[in-house]
Amino acid sequence: MSNTNNIQEEWTEMVEEMNNAVADSMEQNMKAQAAFVESWADAVEDTIPKEEDLADGMDGYNRAYEEWIDAAEQMVERSTDAAQGEDVDPAEFRDIWLQSANEAFKHVMGTSAFAAANGQLVESMMEMQQEADDLSQDALEQMGFPTRNDVDEVAERLIELERRQHAVEQKLDRVLEHLEE
């Protein structure tokens, strides 16, 4: 009977260890998922425009749309005038569209949404430029060419040597002056 109890205890112990392993695994999985969601939320949070920027952007687009509608109405009016025999200069049509395009772009580009998007674009471009620069420096280093850091270091050393040389020349001049007296 003690053998049966022993087997039962071993079985219970093994099941308990398995349960603990599963619980530990689930806990680690939950922590990993939470870390992923937090990381994802942090990354996405910066890309979502603020509500006031979004509203300002929509307002700008609406004003731009109104400019285009006004231009279309002016075009219809001038086309009707031309059809009725009035002498309409073709440059007038071009001017209507150019003026309305300028006004529409002002409405859109003057919004905080446009400024925010432009800022993100510039930031992304600067990051890409830095990454490309880092890659080119790594490639130069791997090929045995001097990198920007190497050239900067040599330049600093050269400047220091020139400074020291100048100091030695000044001391030598003082010694020579003293000897000539």
UniProtKB/Swiss-Prot annotation:
GO terms for biological process: poly(3-hydroxyalkanoate) biosynthetic process; poly-hydroxybutyrate biosynthetic process. InterPro entries: PHA_synth_III_E (IPR010123). Its EC number is 2.3.1.-. One of its GO terms (molecular function) is acyltransferase activity. It comes from the Archaea. Pathway: Biopolymer metabolism; poly-(R)-3-hydroxybutanoate biosynthesis. PHB and PHBV are desirable bioplastic due to their biodegradability, biocompatibility, and mechanical properties. However, PHBV has better mechanical properties than PHB. Keywords: Acyltransferase, PHA biosynthesis, PHB biosynthesis, Transferase. Disruption phenotype: Depletion of both phaC and phaE genes leads to complete loss of the PHA synthase activity. Involved in the production of polyhydroxyalkonic acids (PHAs), which are water-insoluble biopolymers used as intracellular energy reserve material when cells grow under conditions of nutrient limitation. PHAs are composed primarily of 3-hydroxybutyric acid (3HB) and 3-hydroxyvaleric acid (3HV). Required for the production of poly-beta-hydroxybutyrate (PHB) and poly(beta-hydroxybutyrate-co-beta-hydroxyvalerate) (PHBV). Heterodimer with PhaC. Belongs to the PHA/PHB synthase family. This is Poly(3-hydroxyalkanoate) polymerase subunit PhaE. The gene is phaE.
